């Protein structure tokens, strides 16, 4: 249970091992000053070993910096005279007030001067042919762009594109749609997700075609919708993630080729949005959403800080195991284990050794704000024996992934705050452990290890800090301490509802299950079991089988780790308590 300080995703997606010529990239921009997330893509391309910036096309029809604003009364009079702007006035006022809620140091829409990043890149200043919201490129500009023999054009500017520009690059014009295109088409980005209470806010990368929202969807990423009433905050994670998504697909194109990229495109699906096209909200719509939202926040404000999240673990023996169930899951029969004052217990794992089942878990020390790893014997009656501390570092540890191999017991705890993936071996099980090797210097979260058919598999989650973990990557090696090989099916998931690991993979009755967290409604909200259907060095497929939400036990607000060993099951749960009662 931790949030890493940095991300390895940028460095991973800057390096390709394929022996192919570098991708020739063109950029469509509205000017040298671009949002921070765009600047990040430009920087990553420039620092990659597989792509080259060959051309920049500046939109000379883009809005220019606004002249000095008129006094407020004059602006109000001008707005109120227009019936259309009158209907939308409240949203404009809301945006001005909400702008101050954006993060000061890491706003992905903050303007960045990209001129230094683009120094030396050929530039075209282009006046598009404008018709309504549509832009077409003049024939002479098309000829010049064709001369660059571009592989991909990345659209960060201009309006809706039509005409020959869509065909001039070998693999088309790639464009980001800031929303999940299966549910939200139109705009403004990330407002309607808040308005409708959508659990996730997405970003979609597509290859543009003549038909709006009908391009080839190369990929999408889904982030938790930020609770509350701030679009400025809700947009941050998806915009940051859009830069990662674009680099991931460019990397995939170079590493594996166009046919592979095209085969992994997301197939068309029926549009499920409540509106055909979302538009700027009217005054009535803003008021209908904003007033009750603010009122609810005001009512809850006096209680903020009175309750704090507190995690515990629970055991069940002899019940119908979760893997054998379908939705809705039956979680009856679990018994909670109380934590001593000053501690919480979470991230439980089970292992059988010498006829005894042991539980390993994160033992969080409130006084030091860090986790250590503790363990206890699972008693025949379903409780735990004495809790014993078994692994401690001067940095936070959690998610004690314990497993056996060739008679030894190993552990890979999460140590993302140290920027490492560490392998420990038990020298005197269960309480004495020795660092065997630092497997990777990556800020991987909740690394889950699996051994099958002579190969080792490492499932690791990553974040775009300071955002949540929405990216699951799979690596494999020919030995436990061998070199990690990036799996071609990566990313396994870019969905906050199923990316992050939620416990050890297990095999029962010939079926393999990977537990995964659902963080859409808040950190550690729920979890699911996913049956692994295909696992080879070339392919990976899984399917969800059963999901668990915190409603299974009164008072829970989260439940995010599950383990199974024989007839014993273990789970954790989070509830809100008075801090004075547990610290």
Regions inferred by a protein language model and the residue ranges of each:
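One-carbon transfer enzymes
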Residues: 2-397, 401-404, 409-410, 422-425, ...
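Aromatic-anchored, glycine/proline-accented short structural segments
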Residues: 436-507
């Amino acid at each position: 249970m931790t949030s890493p300080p940095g991300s390895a995703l940028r460095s991973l997606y800057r390096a390709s091992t394929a022996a192919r010529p570098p991708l020739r990239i063109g950029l469509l921009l509205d000017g040298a000053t671009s949002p921070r997330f765009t600047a990040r893509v430009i920087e990553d391309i420039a620092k990659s070993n597989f792509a080259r910036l060959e051309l920049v096309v500046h939109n000379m029809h883009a809005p220019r910096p606004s002249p000095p604003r008129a006094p407020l009364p004059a602006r109000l009079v001008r707005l109120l005279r227009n019936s259309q702007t009158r209907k939308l006035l409240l949203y404009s006022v809301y945006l001005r007030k909400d702008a101050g809620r954006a993060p000061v140091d890491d706003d992905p829409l903050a303007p960045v001067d990209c001129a230094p990043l683009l120094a030396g890149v050929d530039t075209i200043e282009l006046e598009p042919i404008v018709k309504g919201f549509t832009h077409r490129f003049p024939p002479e500009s098309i000829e010049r762009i064709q001369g660059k023999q571009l592989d991909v054009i990345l659209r960060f500017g201009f309006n809706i594109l039509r005409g020959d520009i869509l065909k001039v690059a070998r693999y088309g014009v790639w464009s980001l749609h800031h929303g999940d295109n299966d549910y939200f088409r139109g705009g403004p980005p990330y407002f309607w997700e808040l308005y409708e209470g959508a659990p996730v806010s997405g970003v979609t990368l597509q290859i543009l075609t003549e038909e709006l929202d009908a391009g080839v969807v190369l990929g999408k990423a889904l982030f938790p919708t930020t609770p509350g009433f701030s679009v400025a905050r809700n947009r941050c994670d998806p915009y940051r993630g859009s830069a990662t998504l674009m680099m991931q697909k460019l990397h995939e194109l170079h590493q594996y080729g166009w046919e592979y990229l095209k085969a992994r495109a997301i197939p068309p699906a029926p549009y499920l949005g409540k509106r055909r096209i979302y538009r700027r909200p009217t005054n009535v719509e803003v008021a209908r959403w904003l007033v009750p939202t603010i009122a609810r926040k005001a009512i809850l404000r006096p209680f903020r800080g009175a309750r704090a999240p507190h995690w515990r673990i629970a055991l069940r023996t002899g019940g119908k195991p979760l893997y054998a169930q379908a939705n809705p899951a039956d979680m009856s029969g679990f018994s909670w284990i109380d934590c001593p004052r000053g501690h919480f217990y979470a991230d439980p794992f089970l292992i059988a050794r010498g006829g005894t089942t042991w539980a390993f878990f994160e033992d969080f020390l409130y006084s030091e704000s860090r986790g250590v790893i503790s363990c206890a014997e699972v008693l025949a009656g379903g409780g735990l024996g004495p809790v014993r501390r078994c692994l401690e570092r001067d940095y936070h540890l959690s998610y004690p992934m314990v497993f056996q191999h060739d008679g030894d017991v190993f552990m890979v705890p999460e140590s993302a705050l140290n920027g490492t993936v560490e392998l420990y071996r038990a020298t005197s099980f269960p309480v004495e452990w020795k660092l065997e090797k630092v497997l990777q210097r990556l800020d991987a979260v909740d690394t889950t290890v699996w051994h099958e058919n002579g190969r080792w598999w490492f499932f690791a989650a990553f974040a775009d800090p300071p955002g949540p973990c929405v990216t699951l990557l799979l690596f494999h090696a020919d030995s436990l301490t061998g070199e990690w090989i990036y799996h071609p099916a990566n990313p396994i998931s870019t969905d906050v509802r199923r990316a992050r690991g939620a416990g050890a993979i297990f095999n029962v009755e010939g079926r393999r299950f990977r537990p995964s967290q659902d963080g859409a409604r808040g950190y550690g909200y729920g979890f699911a079991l996913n049956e692994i259907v295909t696992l080879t060095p070339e392919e990976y497929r899984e399917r969800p089988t059963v999901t668990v939400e915190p409603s299974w036990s009164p008072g829970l607000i989260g439940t995010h780790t599950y383990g199974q060993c024989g007839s014993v099951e273990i789970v954790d749960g989070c509830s809100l308590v008075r801090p004075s009662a547990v610290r």
